[in-house]
């Protein structure tokens, strides 16, 4: 038995655009999100450029205390998922609990979470 999968909404959080419309416009116009790293001082690194997402406020999704425990990827994924649901005109308040089994959001990331891993292992490495 095969079942159809239908993509009805999109969301994007990317170095070259926050939101699917900004992302698509910048992509079509050849706008790159690669810049000199600004989230920390990269002067001691051989590579000082990266694709950082600029202008995103994770406190719109989580409290400051929660943000200290989460990877930056989590609020980005939530924001993209919310945009995809909005783009699909899906109002979650109109769903019964049983309806959620027929709804899915697929999230993809490229290397997100590696900063959190470094944050967790760095103190251990320095103590050795």
Predicted features by range, described:
Residues 118-124:
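Conserved small/polar residues in nucleotide/adenosyl-binding loops
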Residues 2, 88-104, 120:
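Structural signature of cysteine-dependent C-C bond-forming condensing enzymes
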Residues 69-74, 98:
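Active-site nucleophile and cofactor-binding loops and adjacent substrate-binding regions
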Residues 15, 115-116:
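Glycine/Thr-rich phosphate-binding loops of Rossmann-like dinucleotide-binding domains
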Residues 83-84, 105, 110-114:
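A short acidic, glycine/proline-enriched capping/turn motif at secondary-structure boundaries
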Residues 76-88:
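Stable alpha-helical structural segments in soluble proteins, enriched in small hydrophobic residues
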Residues 1-66:
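ACP-dependent fatty acid/polyketide chain-elongation machinery
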